């Protein structure tokens, strides 16, 4: 299974050109849910404003620190990865989906 993680850097728009059927899930970090309408998961930190979060549905779920802290601690905690949401999302994806490949776009921290 391949998982796509989309961040908020300018090249995140490249995700619009990727075929949905390639990915088991599409995980958006923070505002990246606006890049594609077919995202499946949106992960965000505690300080991400509630009015900027998308609405959840049966096929699109929201995930906060209540979930990803447990996942990150499973892999050694924030000491090893820091608070960068690109790394946090990666560890959460690894913990939740156990994918063969994690693909990133828009996470180059420009």
Question: Which residues does each PLM region occupy?
Answer:
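Extreme N-terminal starter segment of soluble prokaryotic enzymes
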Residues: 1-3
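Acidic/Gly/His-enriched mid-domain segments of enzyme catalytic cores or analogous surface patches
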Residues: 12, 17-103, 107-109
């Amino acid at each position: 299974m391949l998982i796509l993680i989309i961040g908020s850097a300018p090249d995140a728009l490249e995700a619009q050109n990727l075929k949905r059927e390639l990915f088991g899930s599409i995980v958006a970090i923070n505002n990246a849910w606006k890049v594609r309408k077919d995202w499946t998961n949106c992960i965000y930190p505690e300080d991400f404003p509630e009015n900027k979060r998308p609405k959840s549905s049966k096929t699109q779920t929201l995930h906060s620190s209540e979930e990803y802290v447990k996942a990150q601690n499973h892999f050694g905690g924030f000491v090893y990865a820091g608070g960068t949401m690109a790394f946090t999302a990666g560890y959460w994806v690894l913990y939740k989906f156990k994918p063969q490949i994690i693909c990133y776009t828009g996470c180059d921290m420009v």
